[in-house]
Amino acid sequence: MAIDFRVRFDVDDVQLSQLHHDAFGGNYELVPWGSRLQRHSKSWVGAFHGTVLCGFVNAAWDGGKHAFLLDTAVATEWRHQAIGTRLVSYLVSDLRTTDIEWLHVDYEEHLAEFYSVACGFESTSAGVLRLK
């Protein structure tokens, strides 16, 4: 069965929380994703195998011209099949239809090739400050 990519789909909080836990580890937490995305995101994309959510990406925004790519997640059994790249591509295509001019992303060094080569992001100088 093929992977179906859905833009701004109706989010099932349990399903997305499970995917997030699988992709990032840590303790499982049920997150109110649907309401959070409605309040803070310009767009989001899910990758589905039938009814199973196997990938997700989100673009939070500042209310203006900038969006921030967050939560790129692919379930462990679905990795290395270009699902992450396609998620970002669908998200970028959707954002191009909006007033967003800049899409930012922060990533760990081991993801540099994914974001720069596969997804087309350019490197810039940036900073981060841990608050807690």
Regions found by a protein language model. Give the residues of each.
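Short amphipathic alpha-helix that is part of the acyltransferase structural core
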Residues: 1-31, 46, 126
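Short alpha-helical
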Residues: 11, 64, 109-113
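Conserved acetyl-CoA pyrophosphate-binding loop and the N-cap/start of the following alpha-helix
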Residues: 78, 82-90
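Short coil/turn segments at alpha/beta junctions that flank glycine-rich nucleotide-binding fingerprints
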Residues: 81, 98-99
